[in-house]
Amino acid sequence: QTITATHTYILGDNDSRNDARQLCFLQAKQQVLEQAESVIQSQSIVTNFELTKDQMTSYSAATLSVEIVKEDVGLSNGQYTLTLTVKTDVDVDQVNSLLAAIVADTTLADRVAQQQQQIRELEGQVQTLNSRLSVATSGTANALRKERKVVFENIAGLDRMQLVAT
């Protein structure tokens, strides 16, 4: 089953288009993963694994790949916007196999949980940096953008690692 989500990001004065794309992708990805989690829970044998909601969220995110399928740049009330549509394909049988493998291997389960926790913390850092950037002067904006770029790179690195783990 293919699940899609769309999110629109309003660019601030200190946002580049690339920054906006990454910020928008994080939000759209979160939306599509939440929808996928509902599908997985309703159409699978996940209940037999006796997973907590946090475990289900972490393991589902680790087993799914999200891709951008559409990007639109626009103008709304005098501000630039970037709208992304993302998708993930949910093969419940494949997800169940991966979930079973994760649950069966406590080392892998711990590693996946740690990666997802790190991603959530980094996403929180992005939001904090975004808030600071929205009121930053031109003098401090460059340093904040560089810091945010490093956080984006760290998130991407963790995303790549989870694909290897599963």
Where are these regions (language model features)?
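Pro/Ala/Gly-rich low-complexity, hydrophilic intrinsically disordered segments
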Residues: D72-T166
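Soluble periplasmic/extracytoplasmic beta-strand elements of cell-envelope proteins
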Residues: T2-I10, T83-D89
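Short alpha-helical interface elements
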Residues: V32, F49-K53, T57, A61, ...
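Structured, amphipathic secondary-structure segments that form assembly/contact surfaces
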Residues: V39-V95
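Short, well-ordered alpha-helical segments
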Residues: T4-T57
